[in-house]
Amino acid sequence: MNKKTRSAISTAASIAIIVIIIIAGAAAYLYYSSTTSSPTTTTTTTTTTSTAQPLTGSLNLITFTDPSNAWLQAAADSFMAANPGVHITIVAQGFSSYTTTEMTSLQAQSPTYDIITDTSTSALGFANYVSNLNGKVTLNTADMPAPQLNFGGYYKLANGTTELIGVPYDTATFTIFYNQTLLSNPTLNSQFQKEYGFSMSPPWSNWQAILDVDNFLVTQTHTVKYGLITDGSQSHDIIDTYPAIYGYYYSHDSSVSGSNPNGGLLNYNIMFNGFAGSSGIPAPSFNGTAGTQALQMMYNLMQYDPQPAGTTVNYGTVFAPLQQGEAWGALMFTADAPAAFAQPPLSSSIAVSSLPGGYAETGTDFYAINKYSNNQALAATFIQYLISPSVNARIYTIAGEFPISKAATAILASNSSIPQQARNVIQAVFNTGAVGWANPPNLTITSSTLIPAFNNPIYTFLTGSTNSTSAAQQALDTAAAAWIKAVG
């Protein structure tokens, strides 16, 4: 979905890890395995930082505490150096509080914060308070993965028109990290292939293949203690993990996906049908056969988690069993890559793959402009500057996060001062971003209503004693009924 809740890693620790990876040339590296090709190369639009008339004015930008703020501050400094009449102040607050500060200010129609930061999930909650950026910011849509832009950047109004309400600045996905050395072990792989008929290593054709690897490495051979770590935390994480699994089943069931097997309808996404109902609103898609199968698969995968399932694993700990050699893989956000690499020697064995079937889930962040700001033109110019390839590339070299720009990715890929292994990571993350369509809804009521209405009954099922089809169906029916009532 998105980096909806940041991992419990301190900023200082993250920066230290980034220094190890970027400057010292990390001992760890990611190897990307996916059947999906990169987007077609296009010419990117260059961005200038000055006009015929000198830029003047002050900007206040509010964001959450994150390593990417080092890049943001550096970009602000260079922008101000090129435009002496401009002053930019960056206000960083904790992830749990910054949205409250933003919303309180916006609801009061205050011009205090010219630029706000939001995530894929929270973006539409701000839709009524931010400016339509169409005509204000020029996007080269061929230069950024469409799923990253669609999931939080666009808002479809009731009259059918679409507004650009935010601009993504990083690429982030929810996908599979795994122990490459273990899964490619010749002896184990030979034994596995004789029994199951395919390789343990990715790409995997479906989720049953993942479950087979779990069973082989944990139950049959006792090679590791845990399987693919699958986060079923009730507070938020279920709404990320379930659609990541459900995406496969959704795309293979035209009765729910219709003509939109890779993403569904804008803002509704895959947890609603890929087509509108008679009222013009799509119905929930997950309470049918495809959704039930996905939920039962999630239950089965969580049996290979640290127990009791649903209480031990969360955003801040999902990578720990993999990092410590106790699990063969983890379903997690790419933003956690620095944490996953923090502990050698196993860090050198960690690789990343797309989800079974060759897709991923999106989890990026956005900058939006306060519609009550008195400096909207200047704010748009600064955002344009941040996504220009040369500036956007520095989000990796300064902060260890991954650029949204394809041209920025190419700049980094050709930079011989960056270790080849690290360059593989950069390209890998961009590639998963291009297929990050397996997303939950990002409607205005997603955070306040839809997430708890879904997570609560699903958590009860996941932590229950039965994986029966009827129990799964009942949980999904309960969630679907609540969604129908909420959405209309």
Language-model features, listed with the residues they occupy:
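Short helix-initiation/N-cap motifs at beta->coil->alpha
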Residues: 92-101, 205-209, 309-323
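Hinge/lid segment of periplasmic solute-binding proteins
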Residues: 119-178, 208, 349-353, 415-421
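Glycine-centered hinge/linker elements that transmit conformational signals in sensory
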Residues: 211-215, 249-312, 341-342
